Amino acid sequence: FCYLPDDPGVCKAHIPRFYYNPASNKCKNFIYGGCGGNANNFETRAECRHTCVASGKGGPRP
């Protein structure tokens, strides 16, 4: 799921979240709508980094 694009979902809330960007190998912020979306959605940058950067699950695809 670290390779999924950022997806704000279908609802209209304005919730700051983070997603992993494999092109830059970094976690970036985006605005989540509150429902829907996908699993590339983290409450904190640290959680995103731990899941996708530090674990080796992220990075450019070979």
UniProtKB/Swiss-Prot annotation:
One of its GO terms (molecular function) is toxin activity. Keywords: Disulfide bond, Ion channel impairing toxin, Potassium channel impairing toxin, Protease inhibitor, Secreted, Serine protease inhibitor, Toxin, Voltage-gated potassium channel impairing toxin. Serine protease inhibitor that inhibits trypsin. The recombinant protein also barely blocks voltage-gated potassium channel Kv1.3/KCNA3 (3.70% inhibition at 60 nM of toxin). Belongs to the venom Kunitz-type family. The keyword Secreted applies. SUPFAM superfamilies: BPTI-like (SSF57362). Disulfide bonds join C2-C52, C11-C35, C27-C48. CDD domains: Kunitz_PPTI-like. The record marks K12, A13 as: Reactive bond for trypsin. GO terms for cellular component: extracellular space. It is found in: Secreted. The lineage of its organism: Eukaryota, Metazoa, Chordata, Craniata, Vertebrata. The keyword Secreted applies. Expressed by the venom gland. This is Kunitz-type serine protease inhibitor. It comes from Eristicophis macmahoni (Leaf-nosed viper). Its main location: secreted. SMART domains: KU. InterPro entries: Kunitz_BPTI, Kunitz_BPTI_sf, Prtase_inh_Kunz-CS, TFPI/VKTCI-like. Residues 2-52 form the BPTI/Kunitz inhibitor domain.
